[in-house]
Amino acid sequence: MAATQEEIIAGLAEIIEEVTGIEPSEVTPEKSFVDDLDIDSLSMVEIAVQTEDKYGVKIPDEDLAGLRTVGDVVAYIQKLEEENPEAAAALREKFAADQ
């Protein structure tokens, strides 16, 4: 089962807090990673890696550059999960077991 928008935002908020120290309440769909949350490119790569692990998706570098807001990432994850739900579910289960 694919994650809901709210679940993805909550998961991203946890990752962003861990990587940058930004409060989860600041992470909302309309927020820009650079302009609003002041996240640099190195932190963005770390967020992407952890997001890939958590949601069982692969975010190529060329796609990462186009993901400017939290909402962009949510939509991207949902699209990838819809395209390959079995792989996403298996990786999410593995990630949950590792917690």
Curated annotation (Swiss-Prot):
The keyword DNA-binding appears for this protein: no
Xref: Pfam families: PP-binding
GO cellular component, one term: membrane
Gene3D superfamilies, sorted: ACP-like (1.10.1200.10)
Cross-link (Isoglutamyl lysine isopeptide (Lys-Gln) (interchain with Q-Cter in protein Pup)): K79
Claim: Cytoplasm is one of the keywords in the record: yes
Post-translational modification: 4'-phosphopantetheine is transferred from CoA to a specific serine of apo-AcpM.
Disulfide bonds: none
Locations listed in the record: Cytoplasm
GO molecular function per UniProt: acyl binding; acyl carrier activity
Modified residues (O-(pantetheine 4'-phosphoryl)serine): S41
HAMAP family found in the cross-reference section: Acyl_carrier
Family per record: Belongs to the acyl carrier protein (ACP) family.
Protein name, per record: Meromycolate extension acyl carrier protein
Organism: Mycolicibacterium smegmatis (strain ATCC 700084 / mc(2)155)
